[in-house]
Amino acid sequence: MIVTTPKKIPPMEEIGDEIYKIILPQPFYAPNNIYLFVDNDGLTLIDSGYIESVPMLQASLKTRGFSLRDIKNIIYTHNHLDHISSSLVLKSYAPKAVYYGYRAMQDGVGNYLDSMRLFEQATEDLFTVAFGDPEQLNKIISESRSGWENFYSKFDKTKKGDPILRIDKAIDHNDSLEIGDRLFRFIYTPGHNLYHITPVIQESGAYFSGDLIIANLTAIYSEMDGSLGDYHFTLSKLLEEPIKRLLPAHGHEIEDPMRTITLVKKTLSILEKGVIRRLKESPSDLLNLMEAAIGKKVHNGGHLPTALGLIYSIIKKLVLEGLIEIEKRDNGYEVFHLKG
């Protein structure tokens, strides 16, 4: 990958408590918030963005007199490609950087490209469950494959990339580590993702929540690497924390953390009741249940797998509770019936 200056440079702006933020656009989802700290010997980052965003990250750092080589520490909230895939090439441009992540993540992921191919297949399996119309299914799978090929091609074009995910310092739940000039505490916060952690600066009460909560909403990938049960547990755990600032990886800072976390828990309950109510009226499939609960707008902007995964996680919970049964068709398509 040739690292060049983009046409529009995202600013590296200070947002209080000696925290900086860079908003990196990406081709398939909402822009990523990269949080930074200026230390005596360089920079500490929380997440580093999509592989294609490296030039924008470099250009933004340059506006404050820094370069990629000034990056000394990178803390990863989790291993989704819009947060961590840039690390596959940053190892060459920031050779002294130390990478931090959840202990199980490195061994669990291994070859990052191979792990993303499994993720791609899981996405297609979810589409197969949801779309009963073969023509519509083929169209959505073709679009999905095109997006994934674009990602793989970005790595193939670089001569400095390494597909093996590297974690130098493994993190466990409730670890406290001095990184750069600050003391961080880490909370293991699964639900959105199996390896998700939340870095905390206890001195300021700043919690960097990754993808746990995005603009009062949630993202659970269900069949891929998320868990509705874990997510409920994580939200309850966060409600016990002395959170003063909740800084997500997408969107604006959460203004009222406790109220928002409580609202997300209530929203999940409302969605569950909505699924039951609609199945009382008639059997339905995943696509129609998702559109009734969230709306058709999610078909645009890369949100479709997230929305389907969220509703499917609710359906599986209700199946385990004996409230719903699944009618499986030969092609993988599923229709859901309310028991009784």
Residue spans for each PLM region:
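C-terminal regulatory/interaction regions
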Residues: 1, 277-340
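A structural signal for the main folded, soluble domain(s) of proteins
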Residues: 8-14, 18, 34-39, 50-55, ...
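Conserved beta-strand hairpin/beta-sheet module of binuclear metal-dependent hydrolase folds
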Residues: 8-64, 197-212
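Short, charged, surface-exposed secondary-structure boundary motifs
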Residues: 31, 108-113, 217-221
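Metallo-beta-lactamase
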Residues: 43, 50-52, 149, 158-162, ...
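Active-site HxH/HxHxD metal-binding segment of metal-dependent hydrolases
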Residues: 53, 62-169, 173-177
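Histidine-centered divalent metal-coordination motifs
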Residues: 77-83, 102, 192, 250, ...
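Aromatic/hydrophobic pocket-lining residues that form the small-molecule binding cavity
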Residues: 84, 231, 235, 311
